[in-house]
């Protein structure tokens, strides 16, 4: 059965519901989505190389998906993000929180992404194993390195990862991650 997505305006006000295929065809319909920035104590963020119908083989943050409408209920961002981490990396019990959102439109052929995208963050220091059904691979990278790579090669990242990383940089958590990475580098040079 096809997933039902939650249609919203640019301020995340619910306007209705539509099948996933309708939301991603032509100009699509603006719907709820999220991208997850998973970080560790070293100040690194988890990146995955996507294996999806849209924007495949590009770098993404740790996970991205949509809150769903099912059995008359709307899945919350937190519930959807927890589902995503379980499905994509087998991770459970991570404390995840929304720190911001942005709107974007990204066409690809006759399909598109047209999303109000929440940036969700969580800390994780354990081992990671990507689900080979949804990712070609993954890597940890500092936020500074990721932002530099986005500037050098923007086409190698999905649009929502580029926008999410830039939003993270402006947030107090992003500033802390940048500082943590700098402190670790300075300590290793002593």
Each model region followed by its residue ranges:
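Acidic, metal-coordinating catalytic segment for phosphate/diphosphate chemistry
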Residues: 1-35, 39-42, 50
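Sequence-level motif detector for i,i+2 pairs with an aromatic at +2
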Residues: 2-3, 10-13, 42-43, 56, ...
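Surface-exposed, flexible loop/turn segments at secondary-structure boundaries
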Residues: 13, 44, 53, 104, ...
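Conserved Nudix-box catalytic region and its N-terminal flanking loop in Nudix hydrolases
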Residues: 22-34, 44-83
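Active-site segment of metal-dependent pyrophosphate-handling enzymes
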Residues: 42, 50, 77, 86-127
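Nudix hydrolase/Nudix homology domain
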Residues: 55-59, 63-64, 69, 100-103, ...
């Amino acid at each position: 059965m096809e997933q039902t997505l939650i249609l919203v305006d640019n301020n995340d006000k619910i306007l209705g519901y539509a099948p996933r295929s309708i939301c991603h065809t032509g100009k699509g319909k603006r719907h709820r989505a999220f991208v997850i920035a998973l970080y560790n104590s070293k100040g690194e963020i988890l990146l995955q190389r996507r294996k999806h119908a849209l924007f495949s083989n590009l770098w993404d943050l740790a996970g991205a998906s949509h809150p769903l409408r099912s059995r008359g209920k709307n899945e919350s961002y937190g519930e959807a993000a927890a589902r995503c981490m379980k499905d994509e990396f087998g991770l459970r019990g991570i404390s995840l929180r929304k720190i911001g959102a942005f709107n974007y439109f990204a066409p690809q052929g006759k399909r598109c992404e047209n999303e109000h995208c929440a940036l969700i963050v969580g800390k994780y220091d354990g081992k990671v194993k990507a689900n080979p059904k949804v990712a070609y691979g993954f890597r940890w990278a500092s936020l500074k390195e990721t932002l530099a790579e986005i500037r050098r090669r923007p086409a190698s990242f999905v649009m929502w990862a580029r926008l999410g990383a830039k939003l993270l940089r402006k947030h107090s958590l992003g500033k802390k991650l940048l500082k943590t990475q700098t402190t670790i580098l300075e300590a290793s040079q002593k």
